[in-house]
Amino acid sequence: MKVGRDYLFSLLKHHRLLVKVKRAYHRTTDSHHRFYCHPNKIKDGFKPERPEQLWVADITYLPTYEGNSYVSLITDAYSRKIVGYSVDDNMQTKAVKQAFIRALRERRNQDTLIHHSDRGSQYCSKEYQDLHSRHKVVCSMTDGYDCYQNALAERVNGILKMEYLLRKPKDVAQARKMVAESVEIYNQMRPHTALKYKTPDEVHRAF
C-alpha cells in the first residue's frame, strides 16, 4: 500500500503518533529601527500566476557546534523554488543581501516583481533597498511582526530545517555546504501537494 507524505502525517496526527519537535526560539527579526517600512502589498490576497511575480524572503537560525549561523532564503511564491540563499555567522545586511543578489542573477525576465519580507532592519536598510531600486523590484513588508503574513517563507524554512538539515554542522563552512546540498535536493526532488506533486524546479522551468 502506497500513501503520500501529507496523508501519512495526517494519519499519524489523528492517532497522536507524531513526535513533537522541540525548537529553540531564536529571534531573527529586529523591527525596532529608524528605517522606512514599506506597506504590505499582498495582504489583500495577491496570488502569482507564474514564476517571478512574487518572491518571499526570510532569515532562519541554524546552530553549529562552533557558534551561530543564519540562513537567508528567497523563495518564488508560485513555484516554491528557493531562488536565492546565503549562510553567514551574522545577520548583517551585507550577509543577508547575498541571497537577494543570487536570486536576481538568475532572474529571467524584467516584468513586475514583488519582494515580500518582514520588517527586519536588514530588509529596510538603504543598502538592501538600493537593490530594489536598481533592479526595479517592488518592496512589500508585513504589518508588524506577524509570521502569518509571511507564511510561505516560514514554511519553506521549516521544510529545509526539519526534513534536510537534520545534522548539526561543525561550523559555518560546513553549514554552507549542507544548505547548498539541501536547497538542491529540495528544488529538484521534493514534490509539493500545492504543485500537484511536481517539484519546484519542474514548475519553475515550465514558464
Locate each region found by the language model.
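C-terminal domain-tail junction helix/linker
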Residues: 133-137, 159-207
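Basic, flexible linker segments flanking DNA-binding modules
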Residues: 1-50, 199-204
